[in-house]
């Protein structure tokens, strides 16, 4: 599968997923292609992987991997809980536990 068709398929997978699984508070929202964007993408031999997100308020993040040998895609859906900074001077290099 070429990269362009893989990107289109991934965006459609996310649109279908969101529209079937959206929160009750988002029932009036319909996701469209312009709400989906690619964060990162890579093609190696017959395999593809892409990380995508959306402009939707749900905070979901998607990872889609295409297995070119089996002609199937695996979809992982993530929710970002928090983003915080740890400065290098605060790194703890001791193994705990």
Predicted regions and their residues:
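Amphipathic, interaction-prone secondary-structure segments
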Residues: 34-72
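Amphipathic alpha-helical interaction segments
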Residues: 14, 25-26, 48, 89
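Short non-domain terminal segments
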Residues: 4, 16, 35, 82, ...
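Intrinsically disordered, low-complexity regulatory segments enriched in Ser/Thr/Pro
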Residues: 57-97
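N-terminal trafficking/processing presequences and adjacent post-cleavage segments
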Residues: 1-22
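Transition segment at domain starts
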Residues: 15, 26-33, 40
């Amino acid at each position: 599968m070429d990269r362009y068709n893989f990107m289109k398929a991934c965006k459609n997978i996310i649109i279908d997923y969101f529209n079937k699984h959206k929160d009750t508070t988002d029932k009036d929202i319909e996701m469209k292609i312009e709400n989906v964007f690619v964060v990162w993408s890579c093609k190696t031999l017959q395999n593809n992987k892409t990380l995508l997100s959306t402009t939707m308020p749900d905070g979901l993040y998607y990872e889609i991997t295409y297995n070119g040998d089996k002609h199937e895609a695996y979809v992982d859906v993530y929710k970002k809980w928090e983003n915080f900074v740890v400065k290098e001077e605060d790194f703890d290099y001791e193994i705990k536990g």
